[in-house]
């Protein structure tokens, strides 16, 4: 049976949590999110939160973004951002560091939608094929995105047409990245 994006994301989240616990003997810790409410929070301690990914009861709705930009988002994009709450997770792709972007709370989801919309508007203005970012890299202008037309996971230079396919789809990409704790 073919794995879904939701399953692949849950699998990576568990691999990340296990790697963190193996190294630090506790759930993943985050100081930056300590004052923000989230269903991910398991415990607060020493100005930080211990957290774990939390599945959404219902898939998040992207209709407002799709209507605003008059574009249907690829199902993989909606599943990637709409299936769970989580802190961002550090990982590597073929030894290259990245930060997998996630949604911490409903308030964070609103900010994400605004950022996706701004990204798509900029791409339309520059006459670039639409993509939605899923990970940040160490290079300020390079992001890892899902191509809205093909579902390919790509490394792209923001504001340009420079793109490199990393994986056929997000399920393959998530299976091949390694948790970096």
Curated annotation (Swiss-Prot):
Q: Which domain of life is it from?
A: Bacteria
Q: Which InterPro entries match?
A: Syd (IPR009948), Syd_sf (IPR038228)
**Membrane topology of the entry:** Peripheral membrane protein
What Gene Ontology cellular-component terms does the record carry? cytoplasmic side of plasma membrane
Please indicate if the UniProt record lists S-adenosyl-L-methionine as a keyword.
no
CDD domains tied to this protein:
Syd
NCBIfam families, sorted: PRK04968.1
Q: Which family does it belong to?
A: Belongs to the Syd family.
Note the HAMAP family from the entry. Syd
Output this protein's name. Answer: Protein Syd
Q: Which organism is it from?
A: Vibrio parahaemolyticus serotype O3:K6 (strain RIMD 2210633)
Gene symbol here is syd
């Amino acid at each position: 049976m073919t794995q879904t994006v939701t399953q692949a994301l849950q699998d990576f989240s568990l691999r990340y949590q296990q790697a963190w616990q193996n190294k630090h003997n506790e759930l993943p810790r985050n100081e930056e999110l300590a004052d923000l409410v989230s269903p991910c929070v398991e415990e607060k301690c020493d100005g930080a939160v211990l957290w774990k990914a939390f599945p959404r009861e219902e898939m998040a709705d992207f209709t407002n973004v799709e209507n605003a930009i008059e574009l249907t988002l690829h199902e993989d994009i909606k599943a990637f951002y709409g299936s769970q709450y989580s802190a961002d997770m550090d990982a590597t792709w073929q030894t290259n560091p990245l930060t997998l972007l996630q949604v911490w709370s409903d308030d964070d989801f609103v900010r994400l939608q605004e950022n996706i919309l701004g990204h798509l508007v900029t791409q339309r203005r520059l006459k670039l094929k639409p993509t939605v970012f899923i990970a940040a890299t160490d290079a300020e202008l390079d992001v890892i995105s899902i191509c809205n037309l093909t579902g390919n996971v790509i490394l792209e230079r923001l504001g340009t047409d420079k793109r490199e396919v990393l994986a056929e789809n997000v399920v393959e990409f998530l299976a091949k990245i390694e948790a970096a704790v």
